């Protein structure tokens, strides 16, 4: 599907700080993501990626500024916003003592789906994500890659218009990483806006149309990957990060 001029995400003059100044701080942050876009937010550990996503989803409350998702004001705790977005956190969101089916039934009901919608959607997701053979096993028995697939299924159970993913491929094998990325690409082809974070800059290529680099709570640049590398005459985002910040990009900080 082609990109729309409509904004999926519009953040203006965002201000936020953790009590006691513990953690990243935002001051006057602005960010726009178009509807139907594959958008990647990249930065080292501690840069503010997870905090920004938590503000987008309403898990954290901003001190100042505006956050709108498809025109809805996140700060007003509008229930419609919850139906629009799916969130796949870095920390697992499932109940480990339950099976994939039981988890999807619970989160599907929480999202307001009917029993028939839950059954249809559960069967579909278990098939797509390769979980059919373990549909009734407890999730705590799964490998890390299988757990990531369950986490993703929960995030998309209600067919959200915007899917927000925080490090969805962290700690998985190559096969699972490819399976997750391929599924995300398919969702985007059907119109889902993807907002994706990672500290692995190599994942930007092929997945994200637009990328932003964030460091210490500040978005230092945002554009298409091709434009960024061409404009700054760099071969990689790591080199671009070094040019713009004067710091070597590290994944372990």
PLM feature spans:
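A short, flexible loop at the N-terminus of ABC-type nucleotide-binding domains that lies
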Residues: 3-8, 15-28, 78
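Helix-to-loop junction immediately C-terminal to a conserved catalytic motif
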Residues: 57
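Conserved ABC ATPase signature
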Residues: 97, 138-142
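Catalytic Walker B motif of ABC-type/P-loop ATPase nucleotide-binding domains
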Residues: 163-167
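Conserved ABC ATPase "signature" region
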Residues: 105, 109, 116-134
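Conserved ABC transporter NBD signature motif
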Residues: 65-76, 80-81
């Amino acid at each position: 599907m082609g990109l729309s001029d409509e904004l999926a995400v519009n953040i203006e003059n965002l201000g936020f700080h953790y009590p006691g100044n513990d953690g990243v701080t935002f001051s006057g942050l602005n960010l726009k993501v178009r509807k139907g876009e594959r958008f990647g937010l990249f930065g080292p550990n501690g840069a503010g990626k997870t905090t920004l996503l938590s503000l987008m989803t309403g898990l954290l409350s901003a001190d100042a500024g505006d956050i709108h998702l498809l025109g809805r004001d996140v700060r007003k705790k509008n229930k419609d916003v919850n139906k629009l977005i799916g969130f796949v956190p870095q920390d697992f969101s499932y109940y480990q003592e339950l099976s994939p089916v039981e988890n999807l039934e619970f989160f599907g009901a929480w999202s307001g789906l009917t029993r028939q919608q839950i059954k249809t959607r559960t069967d579909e997701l278990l098939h797509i994500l390769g979980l059919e053979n373990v549909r009734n096993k407890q999730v705590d028995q799964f490998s890390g890659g299988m757990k990531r697939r369950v986490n993703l299924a929960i995030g998309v159970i209600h067919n959200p218009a915007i899917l927000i993913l925080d490090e969805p491929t962290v700690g998985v094998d190559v096969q699972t990483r490819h399976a997750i990325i391929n599924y995300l690409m398919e969702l985007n082809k059907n119109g889902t806006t993807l907002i994706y974070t990672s500290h692995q800059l190599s994942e930007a290529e092929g997945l994200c149309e637009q990328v932003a680099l964030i460091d210490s709570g500040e978005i230092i640049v945002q554009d298409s990957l091709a434009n960024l590398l061409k404009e700054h005459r760099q071969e990689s985002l790591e080199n671009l990060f070094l040019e713009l910040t004067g710091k070597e990009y590290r994944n372990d900080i």
